[in-house]
Every structure is written in C-alpha cells, then in structure tokens.
Amino acid sequence: MDELFHVSERKSTIGTELRAGLTSFLAMAYIIAVNPAVLSGAGIDAGALACATCLGAGIMTICMGIFANRPLACASGLGVNAMIAGITTTVCGGDWHVAMSVIFLEGVVILLLVLCGLREAIMDAIPVVLRHAISVGLGLFIAMIGLCDAGIITAGAGTLVGLGDITSPTFIVGIISILVTVALACRNVPGSLLIGIVVAVIAGIPLGVTQAPTGIIAPLDFSSIGGPIADAGGVPAIVKVLTDPALLVISFSLLMSDFFDTMGTAMAVAKQGEFLTDDGNVENIKEILIVDSAAAAVGGFMGVSSITTFVESTSGAADGGRTGLTSVTAGVLFILAAFFSPIVTIVSSAATCGALVYVGYLMMSEASEIDWSDVSQGFPAFMIVAGVPFTYSISAGIGLGFIAYVIVALFKGEASKIKPLMWIAALAFLVYFFVA
C-alpha cells in the first residue's frame, strides 16, 4: 500500500492517511442527509437518494484516490442540487429524470473538454497572482461555510449578515469545535481537526444538537439511478434535453460553474496537501479534472445531482493527507455509510465548524504572496478574495476576478500581455453572468 500510493515518498504514513480520510469524510458527511432533503422536493424518493448519494460519493472518491493519487474527495454539490430541484418543477414539467439529464449532459461535455486539453490549458493560463487569490478566497469561503453552519454567522436584522444567537445550542457546539481544534493545533497534536469534530459531536448530545440515530441499518434503494435513459414523453430524457433550448442554456450555466469550481478547489487542496508547484500549478491536475468531470456525469446518471470535488477536502489535507489513500479511505467510508446512513448523520454541520474555520485560517497565508501595492495585480485578486465568499460561489468570485484582470490590463495598455485563453475565459464569464 505504501508503494502503491507513494506514502513514504510524500513524507506521510499510512496511519496519517487513514486519519485524514476519516477527517474528510466527517467534514463531508452532512451531504448524506442534506442532499436527500433538497432533492426529495423534486419527487425523488429520499431513501433512494441517501443510498445513491453515498454510493456515488464513495465510488468517485475512490476513483480520485486511485487515478489521481491526491487527497481530494467527491460528493453531490450543494447549490446545484437546489437548482435541480427548482428546474424540475419550473422547466422540466415535474420530471426529475429530465433535470438529471441536464447534469449528465454537462458532465459529458466537461469530460470531453478535459480530454481535448482545454480545461487544463485554461487553468495553465491563469496568472499566478489570481491563483494565490483563489486560495485566499476559498479560505474565506470555507470559513464562512463553517461559521454559517454553526449559526455563528446568520442573516442579520436589517443587515445582510450578523452575529448569531450566542445561547443557541448550535452556536455553542460550533464554538466548542473551534476552541478544541485551535487548542490542539497550538500544541501540534496530530489529528487536531478530527478530534475537534469528535469532541463537538459528543458535546452536542446534551445540547440536543447531536440527534440520536433513527436506526442502524438503512435498506439499499437504487430507484434514482438511470434518469437520462428513462422515458420522458416517449423519448429518453437525455434526448428531451438535447432538443430543448431552455434546458441547453441551463446546462451551459452548470458547465461554467463546474468548470471553474473544481479549479479553485483543486488549487486550495493542493496548497494544503503540498502538491502545488512554485509557479502555482497543481500536480496531477489532468487526472484530477478527468475524474471530477466524469463524476458530474455519474451524478446525473445516479440521480444525485452533480458530483464534484468538495472544498471540505482541504480538511483532510490539512490533517496530513498527502496521497490518494486519504481519498480511498473517505470513499470506502461513504460506501459503508450507504448501509449505516442513520448512524453517520449524527455528525452535525456545527460539529465540523472548527475544522473548516481552521482550514480557512491556514489558507489565508497565500495573501502574503500577492503584491497589493500594484493595482493591476492587487485589484483583480481582491475581487476574487471578496467575490468568492460574498457571492457564496467559487465560480462567480473567480469570474469577477478574471473580468477585472482583463479590464485593468486594458486600462494600463497591457492587453497584449494577456494570454488568449484568459480573454476567452473572461468573455465566457460575461455570458455566464447574463445567462445565470
């Protein structure tokens, strides 16, 4: 196993990789309960969704570990699932098979773009300063997710955001999670992120945040699988998507989101996992992008929305994960969760707050690599750093930075220095913003 995953070569140990895989899994486990809750509104059986969510995440995370050998984990993406639930009733005539076919088509197209080298080429064309900014923006985004999930940050009364109710049980569990994680990290205790999650889960029991499981074993239900080939008015659902302009526009919008979300996530995890080169390139990026693109199509076929590389993967990398063994461990746990999902869902999102906030802190170090005194570098970087958390969208934040970079270069008379693919990406984002 050491030789297969190059564990010793990357200055890690099998024990560290297994622990990091468990940390990633626990940081992502909330999706097992949340994804069915969101998509069941589209008419899909919740039990089938829980089963397929676990299996889809498990299979594609294992694939990521084996083929890319990097500590990234995959699962159904939030945001996209809510959009799919919405278009099922508004655009797809209540037929969720058609909605999942939109995801399937988007995944296939992205996979083709990766195989022909376009996605990797665009990533290589991103200026180094924007790569640093993406890591910082992702750090703030991850911290925002953790703080919001724990109710520490909430919608304010008369303001966009505000401090949550400090007497709320979820607030208290979130604070405990942060304090334990930081205290252990200060003492360089191995597995501080994982311990922080476990302590918070235990602390949540008397506070009523950690709910007792409704059972132990969940029956397997595969009825959500096969949406694109299901009948939709006399034709396969995928055919209906290909012949409907409105659905094709939605597929393009999802494609842009997936296209750049994974780029940002890969850079963030690469920084924590120490596989980001000095010039800002992600090692094994082609393999990562191939698996991620295939995962989107697999998610559509399994009826669980787009499966994508999870930004919470940074928690496993921050906990010492350096190889694909971390991913394989998380993937196996997801597959086991298909049988024991009632137990897994006791891990509340508030319990993972400390891990996410601490990872966000670690990623802020990239800000020192940006020359803030140069407006042509600092302003586009700032648009990404501010845009990602404030729009609550990785792709939207990256798009704002790309467009700002091109505009500032035009103002300075340095348009000739911009690589052609950056022009294409900026124009694509303009179209995306109008379409979305």
Describe these PLM feature segments:
Residues 43-62:
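Loop-to-helix transition at the N-terminal end of transmembrane alpha-helices
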Residues 51, 101-104, 252, 290, ...:
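Internal alpha-helical transmembrane segments of multi-pass membrane proteins, especially GPCRs
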Residues 1-48, 161-163, 195-286, 430-431:
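Helix-loop-helix hairpins and the membrane-proximal interhelical loops
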Residues 92-206, 210, 328-436:
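Membrane-embedded alpha-helical modules
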Residues 71, 201, 205, 320:
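Conserved, well-structured core segments that form the ligand-binding/active-site neighborhood
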Residues 1-35, 56, 76-86, 90-138, ...:
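Helix-loop-helix junctions within the multi-pass membrane cores of secondary transporters/permeases
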Residues 60-72, 182-188, 253-261, 292-302, ...:
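Transmembrane alpha-helix interface/packing and boundary motifs in multi-pass membrane proteins
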